[in-house]
Amino acid sequence: MKTLMHICCAPCANRPIDILRADGLEVTGFWYNPNIHPVTEYRARRNCLQAYAQEIELPLILKNDYGLRPFVRAVAEDIANRCVKCYEMRLYETARQAAEGGFDSFTSSLFISPYQQHELMREVAQRAAAEYGVGFLYRDFRPYFQEGQAFAREHGFYMQKYCGCVFSEEERYIKAKKIIP
């Protein structure tokens, strides 16, 4: 079975890729992350993924457009609920790419993160699958999060400290420094 995996970063993708391959799936990676800012962060994550994909011979599709403006336009009216728009942007595009590329299903490395809104992502992915007529391969990879992070550190992967969006980065600094806006 051919599966297109949306990949947010190499640290989150390494365990899901191995698990799906061990299950006999033919995995292709898909990089599309208009939420990641600034451009230096975007490039660091993309470049790390490209090097890892080459190392493990993972076919990788890059939709390599730095998406600051489209992302901000999509979330600006309701910043408090930005995550749903972010998931929609990435998972609908992954479903579209999977359908057009002849894949049997799609999934995302996001499903390994204990920091993401897991059930919301699942609902968005199911809607995207229905809209594009492609299967959604659901796996809860969260039990492998720590193992994947350890693997990433051992292999010298770039390790980010926030989900990627500027609002998440702001929250990280406000919480860390206890700054009152």
Task: Please provide the spans of the model-predicted regions.
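Nucleotide-activated chemistry modules centered on ATP-dependent adenylation/adenylyltransferase
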Residues: 1-181
